[in-house]
Amino acid sequence: MSLSSKLLVYAYYGSYNLPHDRYGESYHLYRIVHEHLTNTYVSNASCVRRDIATARCLNSGHLCFDVARQLLDVSEVAARLSAWFRCGDATGLCADMQRALADIDRHAPLARRVGRRANIFALDAIADIPSDVTNNLQGIIGRFMHFPRCSGLARVADVFDPDIRADGWWYHKFCVLTYMHLVACGAVPAGSATRLRDAVAKHIGPNDEGNCAPAIAAVYGRFCAIGREHFAHHKTACMHILFQFMRNDLTPADERHPCFGVIKDFGRQCKDTYTDLRTHADALYIHGTTDRQKNALFDLLCCVNASDIDADCYDCVVNKFYATQNKKYKM
Protein backbone atom coordinates (compact mmCIF):
# COMPACT_ATOMS: atom_id res chain seq x y z
CA MET A 1 0.00 0.00 0.00
CA SER A 2 1.19 3.53 -0.70
CA LEU A 3 2.61 5.88 1.90
CA SER A 4 0.38 8.68 0.61
CA SER A 5 -2.74 6.58 1.28
CA LYS A 6 -1.64 5.94 4.86
CA LEU A 7 -0.93 9.62 5.44
CA LEU A 8 -4.24 10.69 3.93
CA VAL A 9 -6.28 8.26 6.02
CA TYR A 10 -4.44 9.02 9.25
CA ALA A 11 -4.65 12.77 8.58
CA TYR A 12 -8.39 12.47 7.93
CA TYR A 13 -9.13 10.72 11.20
CA GLY A 14 -6.54 12.72 13.11
CA SER A 15 -8.23 16.00 12.20
CA TYR A 16 -11.74 14.76 12.97
CA ASN A 17 -12.07 16.69 16.23
CA LEU A 18 -10.06 19.75 15.17
CA PRO A 19 -11.98 23.03 14.64
CA HIS A 20 -12.87 23.65 11.01
CA ASP A 21 -11.92 26.95 9.34
CA ARG A 22 -15.56 27.78 8.51
CA TYR A 23 -17.77 25.59 10.71
CA GLY A 24 -15.65 25.46 13.86
CA GLU A 25 -16.49 22.53 16.12
CA SER A 26 -19.72 21.97 14.18
CA TYR A 27 -18.12 20.72 10.96
CA HIS A 28 -19.30 17.12 11.17
CA LEU A 29 -22.76 18.27 12.21
CA TYR A 30 -22.70 20.43 9.08
CA ARG A 31 -21.77 17.38 6.99
CA ILE A 32 -24.67 15.42 8.49
CA VAL A 33 -27.32 18.09 7.95
CA HIS A 34 -26.02 19.16 4.53
CA GLU A 35 -26.21 15.57 3.37
CA HIS A 36 -29.77 15.41 4.68
CA LEU A 37 -30.97 18.63 3.06
CA THR A 38 -29.35 17.90 -0.31
CA ASN A 39 -30.09 14.16 -0.23
CA THR A 40 -26.51 13.37 -1.24
CA TYR A 41 -26.09 10.19 0.79
CA VAL A 42 -23.67 7.54 -0.42
CA SER A 43 -24.89 3.94 -0.11
CA ASN A 44 -27.93 5.27 1.80
CA ALA A 45 -25.78 5.90 4.89
CA SER A 46 -24.71 9.06 6.69
CA CYS A 47 -21.14 10.27 6.23
CA VAL A 48 -20.35 9.68 9.91
CA ARG A 49 -21.68 6.12 9.80
CA ARG A 50 -19.46 5.45 6.76
CA ASP A 51 -16.44 6.97 8.52
CA ILE A 52 -17.01 4.76 11.57
CA ALA A 53 -17.49 1.64 9.44
CA THR A 54 -14.28 2.35 7.50
CA ALA A 55 -12.30 2.84 10.72
CA ARG A 56 -13.62 -0.43 12.13
CA CYS A 57 -12.61 -2.32 8.99
CA LEU A 58 -9.13 -0.77 9.14
CA ASN A 59 -8.76 -1.75 12.79
CA SER A 60 -9.83 -5.32 12.10
CA GLY A 61 -7.55 -5.68 9.09
CA HIS A 62 -10.45 -6.20 6.67
CA LEU A 63 -9.55 -3.09 4.70
CA CYS A 64 -6.28 -1.69 3.36
CA PHE A 65 -5.38 2.01 3.35
CA ASP A 66 -5.51 2.29 -0.45
CA VAL A 67 -9.18 1.24 -0.41
CA ALA A 68 -9.99 3.25 2.73
CA ARG A 69 -8.69 6.41 1.06
CA GLN A 70 -11.22 5.96 -1.72
CA LEU A 71 -14.08 5.55 0.76
CA LEU A 72 -13.32 8.76 2.66
CA ASP A 73 -13.67 12.38 1.60
CA VAL A 74 -9.98 13.22 1.94
CA SER A 75 -10.02 16.31 -0.28
CA GLU A 76 -9.34 18.79 2.54
CA VAL A 77 -6.54 16.81 4.18
CA ALA A 78 -5.08 16.10 0.72
CA ALA A 79 -4.79 19.85 0.20
CA ARG A 80 -3.08 20.27 3.59
CA LEU A 81 -0.66 17.40 3.00
CA SER A 82 0.10 18.74 -0.47
CA ALA A 83 0.88 22.13 1.09
CA TRP A 84 3.37 20.37 3.38
CA PHE A 85 4.85 18.52 0.38
CA ARG A 86 5.31 21.76 -1.59
CA CYS A 87 6.50 24.14 1.11
CA GLY A 88 6.75 22.31 4.44
CA ASP A 89 3.61 23.90 5.93
CA ALA A 90 1.76 21.37 8.14
CA THR A 91 -0.94 23.79 9.34
CA GLY A 92 -4.32 22.20 9.99
CA LEU A 93 -2.98 18.72 10.70
CA CYS A 94 -3.05 17.05 14.11
CA ALA A 95 0.04 16.95 16.32
CA ASP A 96 0.69 13.25 15.62
CA MET A 97 0.68 13.92 11.88
CA GLN A 98 3.01 16.88 12.26
CA ARG A 99 5.50 14.71 14.15
CA ALA A 100 5.31 12.00 11.48
CA LEU A 101 5.85 14.54 8.72
CA ALA A 102 8.86 15.95 10.58
CA ASP A 103 10.28 12.41 10.62
CA ILE A 104 9.61 11.98 6.89
CA ASP A 105 11.28 15.36 6.34
CA ARG A 106 14.56 13.86 7.51
CA HIS A 107 14.42 11.23 4.77
CA ALA A 108 12.72 13.31 2.08
CA PRO A 109 13.55 16.95 2.79
CA LEU A 110 11.90 19.81 0.96
CA ALA A 111 14.89 20.11 -1.39
CA ARG A 112 14.18 16.59 -2.69
CA ARG A 113 10.47 17.28 -3.03
CA VAL A 114 10.77 20.53 -5.01
CA GLY A 115 10.27 20.08 -8.73
CA ARG A 116 8.09 17.00 -8.43
CA ARG A 117 4.33 16.93 -8.84
CA ALA A 118 3.03 19.41 -6.30
CA ASN A 119 0.81 17.01 -4.34
CA ILE A 120 1.14 14.39 -1.64
CA PHE A 121 0.90 11.47 -4.08
CA ALA A 122 4.34 12.36 -5.45
CA LEU A 123 5.76 11.22 -2.11
CA ASP A 124 5.27 7.60 -3.21
CA ALA A 125 7.95 8.04 -5.88
CA ILE A 126 10.63 9.05 -3.38
CA ALA A 127 12.77 6.14 -2.26
CA ASP A 128 14.54 5.64 1.08
CA ILE A 129 11.56 6.51 3.30
CA PRO A 130 11.36 3.77 5.99
CA SER A 131 8.22 1.63 5.95
CA ASP A 132 7.74 2.12 9.71
CA VAL A 133 7.53 5.91 9.48
CA THR A 134 3.77 5.81 10.15
CA ASN A 135 3.87 3.27 12.99
CA ASN A 136 3.29 5.93 15.65
CA LEU A 137 0.09 7.02 13.91
CA GLN A 138 -1.79 3.79 14.58
CA GLY A 139 -3.38 5.19 17.75
CA ILE A 140 -5.25 7.81 15.71
CA ILE A 141 -7.85 5.30 14.51
CA GLY A 142 -8.47 3.99 18.02
CA ARG A 143 -8.93 7.50 19.40
CA PHE A 144 -11.29 8.36 16.57
CA MET A 145 -13.53 5.41 17.46
CA HIS A 146 -14.23 7.00 20.86
CA PHE A 147 -14.92 10.50 19.53
CA PRO A 148 -18.27 10.11 17.68
CA ARG A 149 -19.74 8.08 20.53
CA CYS A 150 -18.52 10.29 23.37
CA SER A 151 -19.37 13.55 21.59
CA GLY A 152 -22.90 12.47 20.68
CA LEU A 153 -22.04 12.77 16.99
CA ALA A 154 -22.89 9.14 16.23
CA ARG A 155 -26.32 9.61 17.80
CA VAL A 156 -27.11 12.65 15.64
CA ALA A 157 -25.85 10.80 12.57
CA ASP A 158 -28.27 7.96 13.33
CA VAL A 159 -31.17 10.41 13.69
CA PHE A 160 -30.55 11.84 10.21
CA ASP A 161 -29.40 8.56 8.63
CA PRO A 162 -31.96 7.59 5.94
CA ASP A 163 -31.61 3.89 6.73
CA ILE A 164 -31.44 3.91 10.55
CA ARG A 165 -33.88 6.82 11.17
CA ALA A 166 -33.34 6.82 14.94
CA ASP A 167 -35.82 8.85 16.98
CA GLY A 168 -34.57 12.13 18.38
CA TRP A 169 -35.90 13.50 21.68
CA TRP A 170 -34.51 16.95 22.46
CA TYR A 171 -37.48 18.91 21.09
CA HIS A 172 -39.73 16.89 23.37
CA LYS A 173 -37.33 17.60 26.23
CA PHE A 174 -37.35 21.35 25.54
CA CYS A 175 -41.16 21.43 25.47
CA VAL A 176 -41.50 19.30 28.60
CA LEU A 177 -39.02 21.38 30.61
CA THR A 178 -40.55 24.72 29.68
CA TYR A 179 -44.07 23.46 30.42
CA MET A 180 -42.94 21.95 33.72
CA HIS A 181 -41.71 25.43 34.58
CA LEU A 182 -45.19 26.81 33.86
CA VAL A 183 -46.77 24.10 36.01
CA ALA A 184 -44.39 24.93 38.87
CA CYS A 185 -45.25 28.63 38.54
CA GLY A 186 -48.98 27.94 38.51
CA ALA A 187 -49.31 29.40 35.01
CA VAL A 188 -51.36 26.57 33.48
CA PRO A 189 -55.16 26.25 33.40
CA ALA A 190 -56.35 25.44 36.92
CA GLY A 191 -58.50 22.56 35.78
CA SER A 192 -55.53 20.64 34.39
CA ALA A 193 -52.79 21.56 36.89
CA THR A 194 -53.17 18.50 39.14
CA ARG A 195 -53.19 16.05 36.24
CA LEU A 196 -50.15 17.74 34.73
CA ARG A 197 -48.26 17.49 38.03
CA ASP A 198 -49.22 13.83 38.36
CA ALA A 199 -48.01 13.12 34.81
CA VAL A 200 -44.59 14.53 35.68
CA ALA A 201 -44.37 12.72 39.02
CA LYS A 202 -45.12 9.38 37.37
CA HIS A 203 -42.15 9.54 34.99
CA ILE A 204 -39.65 12.18 36.14
CA GLY A 205 -38.01 12.56 39.53
CA PRO A 206 -35.07 14.35 41.17
CA ASN A 207 -31.49 13.10 40.78
CA ASP A 208 -31.80 12.43 37.04
CA GLU A 209 -34.63 9.94 37.46
CA GLY A 210 -36.48 9.99 34.16
CA ASN A 211 -33.83 11.96 32.26
CA CYS A 212 -34.15 9.66 29.25
CA ALA A 213 -36.02 9.57 25.97
CA PRO A 214 -38.81 7.13 26.98
CA ALA A 215 -39.73 9.08 30.14
CA ILE A 216 -39.64 12.44 28.36
CA ALA A 217 -41.76 11.04 25.52
CA ALA A 218 -44.31 9.73 28.02
CA VAL A 219 -44.63 13.10 29.77
CA TYR A 220 -44.78 14.91 26.42
CA GLY A 221 -47.63 12.65 25.35
CA ARG A 222 -49.54 13.32 28.57
CA PHE A 223 -48.98 17.07 28.22
CA CYS A 224 -50.40 16.91 24.68
CA ALA A 225 -53.46 15.02 25.93
CA ILE A 226 -54.06 17.14 29.05
CA GLY A 227 -52.83 20.57 27.99
CA ARG A 228 -54.23 20.39 24.47
CA GLU A 229 -54.50 23.86 22.89
CA HIS A 230 -52.68 25.51 25.79
CA PHE A 231 -49.68 23.18 25.42
CA ALA A 232 -49.77 23.46 21.61
CA HIS A 233 -49.62 27.26 21.82
CA HIS A 234 -46.88 27.02 24.46
CA LYS A 235 -44.68 24.84 22.22
CA THR A 236 -44.97 27.21 19.27
CA ALA A 237 -44.27 30.31 21.36
CA CYS A 238 -41.26 28.83 23.18
CA MET A 239 -39.67 27.52 20.00
CA HIS A 240 -40.10 30.94 18.36
CA ILE A 241 -38.49 32.71 21.32
CA LEU A 242 -35.61 30.22 21.39
CA PHE A 243 -34.74 30.94 17.77
CA GLN A 244 -35.15 34.69 18.26
CA PHE A 245 -32.71 34.44 21.19
CA MET A 246 -30.14 32.54 19.11
CA ARG A 247 -30.54 35.15 16.34
CA ASN A 248 -30.09 38.08 18.78
CA ASP A 249 -33.49 39.38 17.67
CA LEU A 250 -35.60 39.33 20.84
CA THR A 251 -38.46 41.72 21.49
CA PRO A 252 -39.57 43.02 24.91
CA ALA A 253 -42.62 40.77 24.61
CA ASP A 254 -40.34 37.74 24.14
CA GLU A 255 -38.43 38.63 27.30
CA ARG A 256 -41.65 38.92 29.29
CA HIS A 257 -42.67 35.35 28.51
CA PRO A 258 -42.91 33.38 31.79
CA CYS A 259 -40.50 30.74 30.44
CA PHE A 260 -37.94 33.19 29.09
CA GLY A 261 -35.33 32.36 31.75
CA VAL A 262 -35.48 28.65 30.96
CA ILE A 263 -35.47 29.30 27.20
CA LYS A 264 -32.46 31.60 27.55
CA ASP A 265 -30.49 29.06 29.61
CA PHE A 266 -31.33 26.38 27.06
CA GLY A 267 -30.47 28.62 24.12
CA ARG A 268 -27.10 29.71 25.51
CA GLN A 269 -25.85 26.14 25.12
CA CYS A 270 -27.22 25.79 21.56
CA LYS A 271 -26.25 29.21 20.25
CA ASP A 272 -22.74 28.44 19.02
CA THR A 273 -23.91 25.41 17.07
CA TYR A 274 -26.83 27.40 15.65
CA THR A 275 -24.49 30.23 14.61
CA ASP A 276 -22.13 27.79 12.87
CA LEU A 277 -25.01 26.09 11.03
CA ARG A 278 -27.53 28.93 10.79
CA THR A 279 -28.52 28.49 7.14
CA HIS A 280 -29.03 24.75 7.53
CA ALA A 281 -30.69 25.01 10.96
CA ASP A 282 -33.12 27.64 9.67
CA ALA A 283 -34.02 25.39 6.75
CA LEU A 284 -34.83 22.57 9.17
CA TYR A 285 -36.81 24.99 11.37
CA ILE A 286 -38.86 26.42 8.51
CA HIS A 287 -39.70 23.06 6.98
CA GLY A 288 -40.01 21.09 10.22
CA THR A 289 -43.70 20.34 10.66
CA THR A 290 -43.63 17.00 12.50
CA ASP A 291 -42.31 16.08 15.93
CA ARG A 292 -39.79 13.75 14.27
CA GLN A 293 -38.37 16.62 12.22
CA LYS A 294 -38.30 18.99 15.20
CA ASN A 295 -36.63 16.37 17.38
CA ALA A 296 -33.95 15.92 14.71
CA LEU A 297 -33.33 19.68 14.61
CA PHE A 298 -33.03 19.93 18.40
CA ASP A 299 -30.79 16.86 18.61
CA LEU A 300 -28.51 18.63 16.13
CA LEU A 301 -28.45 21.87 18.15
CA CYS A 302 -28.07 20.20 21.56
CA CYS A 303 -25.46 17.59 20.64
CA VAL A 304 -22.34 19.52 21.61
CA ASN A 305 -23.47 20.80 25.03
CA ALA A 306 -26.07 18.24 26.08
CA SER A 307 -24.57 17.78 29.55
CA ASP A 308 -24.45 21.55 30.11
CA ILE A 309 -28.11 21.87 29.12
CA ASP A 310 -28.93 19.23 31.71
CA ALA A 311 -26.96 21.14 34.35
CA ASP A 312 -28.34 24.58 33.45
CA CYS A 313 -31.92 23.63 32.58
CA TYR A 314 -33.04 20.10 33.34
CA ASP A 315 -31.74 19.93 36.91
CA CYS A 316 -32.93 23.45 37.75
CA VAL A 317 -36.43 22.95 36.35
CA VAL A 318 -36.91 19.53 37.95
CA ASN A 319 -35.60 20.70 41.33
CA LYS A 320 -37.82 23.80 41.25
CA PHE A 321 -40.81 21.68 40.24
CA TYR A 322 -40.42 19.35 43.21
CA ALA A 323 -39.55 22.13 45.64
CA THR A 324 -42.78 23.88 44.64
CA GLN A 325 -44.83 20.69 44.99
CA ASN A 326 -43.35 19.97 48.43
CA LYS A 327 -44.34 23.44 49.63
CA LYS A 328 -47.90 22.89 48.44
CA TYR A 329 -48.14 19.55 50.20
CA LYS A 330 -46.79 21.05 53.47
CA MET A 331 -49.42 23.77 53.31
Curated annotation (Swiss-Prot):
The lineage of its organism: Viruses, Viruses incertae sedis, Naldaviricetes, Lefavirales, Baculoviridae. This is Uncharacterized 37.2 kDa protein. It comes from the Viruses. InterPro entries: AcMNPV_AC11.
